[in-house]
Amino acid sequence: KKYLEDHPLIKECCPEQSLFVNPIFNLQRYAPGEGFKKWHCDWTIGNEATEPVNRVLAWILYCNDVNSGGTEFHWQNHHEIAERGKLIIFPAGISHIHRGRVNNNEVKTIATGWINAGKLENYISRLANS
């Protein structure tokens, strides 16, 4: 809600849309040498109740500092450094294909989640009925 208030152009351009932060998120702990090394984007086409098909934005919260860790964005040729408390938000689609950078000496812990188009009430109702 606050995001839409802070970015009124979204409602102006897409008045039929609303956004909600998906209450389901992932907490991931990678041992040294582990990580999500495969290039990917965060949109989904699944029909599972816990995975709405309308992911708009993705977010990553870095839970610790990791030297040379972080997230690499392919098309942007950009590496976001993993710093404790840093939150990054980016488009979930193919414009922001990304992967985790692996550190062979340190543990990396992140939380990841999504901001979806639609209404939270409808999503919760769908979860309750599945």
Please provide the spans of the model-predicted regions.
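Fe(II)/2-oxoglutarate oxygenase catalytic core
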Residues: K1-L87, S95-S130
